[in-house]
Amino acid sequence: MTLNSSTEDGIKRIQDDCPKAGRHNYIFVMIPTLYSIIFVVGIFGNSLVVIVIYFYMKLKTVASVFLLNLALADLCFLLTLPLWAVYTAMEYRWPFGNHLCKIASASVSFNLYASVFLLTCLSIDRYLAIVHPMKSRLRRTMLVAKVTCIIIWLMAGLASLPAVIYRNVYFIENTNITVCAFHYESQNSTLPIGLGLTKNILGFVFPFLIILTSYTLIWKALKKAYKIQKNTPRNDDIFRIIMAIVLFFFFSWVPHQIFTFLDVLIQLGIIRDCEIADIVDTAMPITICIAYFNNCLNPLFYGFLGKKFKKYFLQLLKYIPPTAKSHAGLSTKMSTLSYRPSDNMSSSAKKSASFFEVE
């Protein structure tokens, strides 16, 4: 694309060097359909997660705080998804004005950072709870968890500011359509490269390394605990869960991160081949569907690793309201934290039985 100086009606006019890139009839049908499915499943699932954690489980643990915020971040994003579905169904014609363009774009960016940061904190919390249960008890408090979530929301908001500032409505003169897009002037290459690298590094590389390290250390601690506790049967499900969590995160986000960076190179004119631009523009919405569908399933995925979460979730589906009896098991909850200081490795093996309990 080449920026033009014309700004009639307050909308900048640009030329699209590859006007047919990513414009395929199957994309205009398939992607809105997938967005609609993600919207329905995500709103339903994440709303139930919020109700279960807040009203049934009463938000009593660190893990539940992170999961609640994860579900809320997903709901904020999902509310803007119908706009993107309409936008794609209308063959990338944006009818909602510049303000909604910025808000919807910021919501997508915010969800990316908030979800990734929360999953990273959740992995650190699991590491501390399982590997260092005694040492971390004073640090793993509800106050610390809530303050951490506030910081995460602020950081995600700051990381989303470029979408508010630089995402705008543009009129493409050679195709006569109005789009909601990032557009960079070719002479200013520092900004888009900086934003692209920030998204790649801050939104994926660093979090993935922390998540990988946390669960690897958990894996090693549990293996060591099982060797010491020879009479304790090894729970292979825990190791499968760890592997699934790491791979789930990696393969959900890698495609989107790769094509995001390629898109920056196209915007800068470093990649000028329209065939490559077509591949990138066609694949981009598909990678978005993969990343954000998995993102919206995360609260359910992590929640269902806890037995009591599944119990309350099924109660909710059966329209059984939360009662005082639902929270009578406080001694059971506290027992998972009552370890003898001299029995740290033994407690790791015991703790693996409730690897992701959020109650």
UniProtKB/Swiss-Prot annotation:
Changes after translation: C-terminal Ser or Thr residues may be phosphorylated.
Pfam families: 7tm_1 (PF00001)
Bias kind Low complexity: ranges: 346-359
Protein name: Type-1 angiotensin II receptor B
InterPro entries (alphabetical): ATII_AT1_rcpt (IPR000190), ATII_rcpt (IPR000248), CCR1-9-like (IPR050119), GPCR_Rhodpsn (IPR000276), GPCR_Rhodpsn_7TM (IPR017452)
Keyword Membrane: yes
Main subcellular location of this protein, as a coarse class: membrane
Residue ranges annotated as Extracellular topological domain: 1-25, 90-98, 166-190, 269-278
Purpose: Receptor for angiotensin II, a vasoconstricting peptide, which acts as a key regulator of blood pressure and sodium retention by the kidney. The activated receptor in turn couples to G-alpha proteins G(q) (GNAQ, GNA11, GNA14 or GNA15) and thus activates phospholipase C and increases the cytosolic Ca(2+) concentrations, which in turn triggers cellular responses such as stimulation of protein kinase C.
Organism: Rattus norvegicus (Rat)
Tissue expression per record: Is expressed in the liver, kidney, aorta, lung, uterus, ovary, spleen, heart, and vascular smooth muscle cell. Expressed most abundantly in the adrenal gland.
Membrane topology: Multi-pass membrane protein
GO biological process: angiotensin-activated signaling pathway; blood vessel development; cellular response to dexamethasone stimulus; drinking behavior; G protein-coupled receptor signaling pathway; inflammatory response; kidney development; maintenance of blood vessel diameter homeostasis by renin-angiotensin
Binding annotation for angiotensin II: Q15, D17, R167, F182, H183, Y184, K199
Entry's family note: Belongs to the G-protein coupled receptor 1 family.
Disulfide-bonded cysteines: C18-C274, C101-C180
Chain segments carrying region Disordered: 339-359
UniProt gene name: Agtr1b
CDD domains named in the record: 7tmA_AT1R
One annotated GO molecular function: angiotensin type I receptor activity
